[in-house]
Amino acid sequence: MKFVDEASILVVAGDGGNGCVSFRREKYIPKGGPDGGDGGDGGDVWMEADENLNTLIDYRFEKSFRAERGQNGASRDCTGKRGKDVTIKVPVGTRVIDQGTGETMGDMTKHGQRLLVAKGGWHGLGNTRFKSSVNRTPRQKTNGTPGDKRDLLLELMLLADVGMLGMPNAGKSTFIRAVSAAKPKVADYPFTTLVPSLGVVRMDSEKSFVVADIPGLIEGAAEGAGLGIRFLKHLERCRVLLHLIDIDPIDGSDPVENARIIIGELEKYSQDLAAKPRWLVFNKIDLMDKSEAEEKAKAIAEALGWEGKYYLISAASQLGVKDLCWDVMTFIIENPIAQAEEAKQPEKVEFMWDDYHRQQLAEVEEDADDDWDDDWDEDDEEGVEFIYKR
């Protein structure tokens, strides 16, 4: 199935049903009073995370989702039926953004998580709600309010513990094939990897982590060059980044300059991403003697001003790969996801009409105090009749 990690959709919640103006009329009960019922609330639109999905391709074709309108109220104090909700299922890891305001409405990070993205309109009030001691035949009612309408941007961001980055042909796909059951395409030309892939690295029966492979970065990636800019966002949720460096590039390029390009593109894209823990991993050491590889790796690290630990591996022959994976596993165990980050609240999104009923009833009460006989006229059989005799 084609990997699609962005989609724009329109969500429209249902309008609220209108209130009803009605008076009870039955045999022997000519003046039964108001009995108009309220309308029904409009249906809501929800997002739900589903671990069985892994792409947003469905929303390239179906772009509009509308909840059902609430039914109008009826006589005999009958309340209108509430509109049916609409639930949109998205892959775990989807971020929901309101395109109109730029607000992030929420991150769908757990299976079964639900997020309200469009709230249905409030029901209108029937005339029964407006009766009082001074207004026994109210002809007021309120209409239902419109439901929320939003243009949403869905961004799928892979959930992985470890992210891999590097220049094209650095050996990222070969590495993920060596440590997991994932089988991304491997070839001797740049940009063999066109879409991100995930692999589960199982260290033993109880310990494992997920590694993400994205297309290689090139200079100018943060401005849109190559494929990297589309997929850098998939590294935002990783806990550690493995920066693979081809220790002996076949094209004769300088490994130091290649590494600086990657670092520069990370900083241009996001300071938060650039600040993540990043490990240097020198790949393809099987192409030279061990001592030569160690000397070259040391020289590159010094040129980059690298003071931390670095690794020498050969993904093709799996030399040094096991030790690297165990160190990654230890780091993940010792650095669990921060509770504050896990419980991070989305930006508060205001929904329309939250105080609608309270405001409407307050206005009616004010009007009743100022002019309590507004609803009476000469043809009103329910009104009070005054006869003056001189």
UniProtKB/Swiss-Prot annotation:
GO terms for molecular function: GTP binding; GTPase activity; magnesium ion binding. PROSITE patterns: G_OBG, GTP1_OBG, OBG. Disulfide bonds: none annotated. Its main location: cytoplasm. Its cofactor is Mg(2+). Residues 1-159 form the Obg domain. Mg(2+) binds at residues 173, 193. Its EC number is 3.6.5.-. GTP binds at residues 166-173, 191-195, 213-216, 283-286, 314-316. It is found in: Cytoplasm. Monomer. Belongs to the TRAFAC class OBG-HflX-like GTPase superfamily. OBG GTPase family. This is GTPase Obg. It comes from Salmonella typhi.
